[in-house]
Amino acid sequence: KRNLILSPAFKEFEQNANPRTREKLRYAISILETVYPVPTKFVKKLVGTDFFELRVSVDNEIRVILFAVDNDNINLATNVILLNGFVKKSTKDYDKEITKAINILR
C-alpha cells in the first residue's frame, strides 16, 4: 500500500466537490493507493515535468489531480503527494496548475 500525503490545496479541492464527484475521486485515489501496477486508464505522467495526473470523469467533465511520487517509476513509489486538483477545460489549464503544484511542493 502506498502512503498518501494530502496537500491543503488538494483537501480544499476535494471538500468543494459535490458528493458524487467526491465519491469518484476517493475511488480513483484508492486505486492509486493500493493497485500494483497502477492502471494507465487512471494515471499518466505529464511530459516534461516531475508530476503525474490522476483523471476522474464525472458528468462529462474531467477532474484532474496532480501528484508527485518518490520514485521515477510510479510502480516502485511508496509515497504519493496529492498536490492540487482542477476541472479540465482546456490544455491551457495545465501550465497554471503545474506552476501551483511546483509551489505547493516547495
What are these regions (language model features)?
Residues K1-I62, N71-N79, V87-R106:
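Basic, Lys/Arg-enriched alpha-helical interface segments
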Residues L83:
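Conserved catalytic cores of phosphodiester-cleaving nucleases, focusing on short active-site segments
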